[in-house]
Each structure stands twice: as C-alpha cells, then as structure tokens.
C-alpha cells in the first residue's frame, strides 16, 4: 500500500510539471505518505477504547467544559487543512470521563477526512452515547484553507458550527450557560 501511495505522489508531481527525481523531491513521496498516515490515523482508533477505560462514578451533575481544544483536520473535498478550536461540554449522569479523554475524542474524529459540520456532530454523538451524559454541547470554530488558499481566497474567515444533545437542546438555561462559558474571558493565565 505504501509503494502505491508513493507512486501516486510521484505521478502528481509529474502532472504539475515537477521532476520527482530532483534532489529536493526524491524523498517527498515517502514524507507525504507518513504525513497522511498520521493525519488519517483517526480511522484506526476506536472511541470506546479511549473513553470506556476512563469513566468514573461521580455524584457531579453540573456542566463539565473543556474549551479551546486545538485541532487540525483535512477537508474531504480538497484534502486541504482546516484547523481551529473545539469547545466540548457535557452534563454527567452518574459518571464522569477523564478530562484528557475529551481532547483525545476530538483528535480521533479530526484525524479523518472531514467537513466541519460532520466533525462537530460526531464528537457530540460519541460523547453522548459512550458517556451516557444527560446532555452534550460542542462548538467548533475553524479556518479552512480551501476557502483561504483557493477559490474565493478569503483569508482569516472563520466558520462556527454547533451540535447540541439532550438537556443542551431541551433546556434554554443550560444552553445559555454553555454559550456564556465558552465566550467568557479566559481566567487562567500561563
């Protein structure tokens, strides 16, 4: 499979008018293979394996929010990057998930060919189903290189998507609290 991939990269280089045998490009097919192997590693990861070992009994029934989770992904339409921040909240239902697992969940879905709308939905649904939460809220803000580098060429434009489940969808006060928290000034200084 690796050789086939590398041969395709060589063909692309030739089609755009490059010489894949020149010094700067000789190792490019292998580098591109390794890059895509990493960038698409989410296909080989199982959400249940990540979350189920990190569920802990808890009486907490208040919102848990992990915000400003930086991510990058590849647009499934152009194979160009999009990147930004995800804000993920849930309300526990007798169990909490280890905090590091929420960014890992974002990473699993971001490391697949994606569109932002689908990424947002997948994160919300996976957390809702695997943690048995009372509700989940996910907001993603991202910049898309397919918008900035080609076509319309609108640099620095941002796309925002949201996905709400359970009490976040049904209860206006929960929804307001979520949006207020993700929009509040950052209090932690590093």
Curated annotation (Swiss-Prot):
Reactions performed catalytically: GTP + H2O = 7,8-dihydroneopterin 3'-triphosphate + formate + H(+)
Binding site for Zn(2+): 75, 78, 146
Keywords of the record: GTP-binding, Hydrolase, Metal-binding, Nucleotide-binding, One-carbon metabolism, Zinc
InterPro entries named in the record: GTP-CH-I_C/QueF (IPR043133), GTP-CH-I_N (IPR043134), GTP_CycHdrlase_I (IPR001474), GTP_CycHdrlase_I_CS (IPR018234), GTP_CycHdrlase_I_dom (IPR020602)
Protein origin, superkingdom: Bacteria
A GO term for molecular function: GTP cyclohydrolase I activity
Pathway note: Cofactor biosynthesis; 7,8-dihydroneopterin triphosphate biosynthesis; 7,8-dihydroneopterin triphosphate from GTP: step 1/1
GO biological processes: one-carbon metabolic process; tetrahydrobiopterin biosynthetic process; tetrahydrofolate biosynthetic process
Subunit field text: Toroid-shaped homodecamer, composed of two pentamers of five dimers.
Protein's name according to its UniProt entry: GTP cyclohydrolase 1
Gene (UniProt): folE
């Amino acid at each position: 499979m690796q050789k086939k991939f590398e041969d395709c990269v060589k063909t692309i280089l030739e089609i755009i008018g490059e010489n894949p045998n020149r010094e700067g490009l000789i190792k490019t097919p292998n580098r591109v293979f390794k890059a895509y192997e990493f960038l698409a590693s989410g296909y080989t990861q199982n959400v249940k394996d990540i979350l189920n070992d990190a569920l802990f009994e808890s009486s907490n029934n208040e919102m848990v929010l992990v915000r400003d989770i930086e991510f990058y992904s590849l647009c499934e339409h152009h194979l160009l990057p999009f990147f930004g921040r995800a804000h993920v909240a849930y309300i526990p239902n007798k169990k909490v998930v280890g905090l590091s697992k929420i960014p890992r969940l974002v990473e699993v879905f971001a490391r697949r060919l994606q569109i932002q709308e689908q990424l947002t939905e997948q994160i919300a649904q996976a957390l809702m189903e695997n943690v048995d939460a009372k509700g989940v809220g996910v907001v993603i803000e991202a910049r898309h290189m397919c918008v900035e580098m080609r076509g319309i060429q609108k640099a620095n434009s941002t796309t925002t998507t949201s996905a709400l489940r359970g009490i976040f969808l049904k209860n206006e006060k929960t929804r307001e609290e979520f949006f207020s928290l993700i929009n509040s000034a950052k209090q932690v200084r590093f």
